[in-house]
């Protein structure tokens, strides 16, 4: 049982108050030693989580040589932003136009004013750089868009693999871009396209060297083929096994990250933007008992604990962009004061101001008890949150550091 008063005292001793990016310098320096810095968020609709991550990202790129940003977004739409950032997209006159490539719900996660400002900054930064900083999506959802991109690229270079790509694409055509329909058919009626997408991915990987006239176009095609293969598996599993589909998704994100890291070279470093539920080590939560893994765990296992620096984010209260049901219109919702005895509550009790904590060997054991830690998704019911929005977590094992913003406000999305 958590002794709240004791926890509050520990936080007072080890937390550092901050008001601006300059105050975060010790945290940024500590994070910069890693190959990958994972920046979380407690919701997908909080302005301050985006703006704080953007400021940390700029510092890591400008002062510590980080090579790219990879986010919890679709690869094809993010690649349009990447093209704009690198000056390769004359059809977009500004970042907002490039971000209108995000069509899939919830588009607000990336088509918003906060991301626009970061994308414009990255473009301006790249103007004076030989090695261009990139912006990529790690998610698995873009099955049809990724298949289209593969077919178009193989047609453009007259590759003999185009027939396999078209065959795979045609296999998905009867499902009218409805992934749930495909998942049901694959799971219950044996109407799977797995062999077609696996065959295509294998062919593309075997012929990788023949696509290298334009290395980034080759990367784009290879990751789109990877998305198609893993999305097929994801939607297949989603219907029958939610935990397994989660694992397929997070393993895909780490695979995509590996492709990007290989493209930028062995010395490259990346900044990753994802929800806390992805970047905070699953082994330090109740996910582990469910047999679930996530990006935080998988990257630590793959690259080593010292090469991954995960920063969780949280708030005591505020407003947020979310929806009442999957696919419904977004709205501004209240974020109630944190539940008594939760992590966000005790951090707030330690001082009603913004603060950060770094978990080190000296203080780690003070924060190893299990405590409820708020997680808000794209679907949110504030009045019900005490029943399902607090993840039992051992904070100092889940993250390397934590940023608490006491009162937060809703993101500024584009409506289109």
Predicted stretch roles:
Residues 1-416:
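Structured catalytic-domain cores with a bias toward divalent-metal coordination
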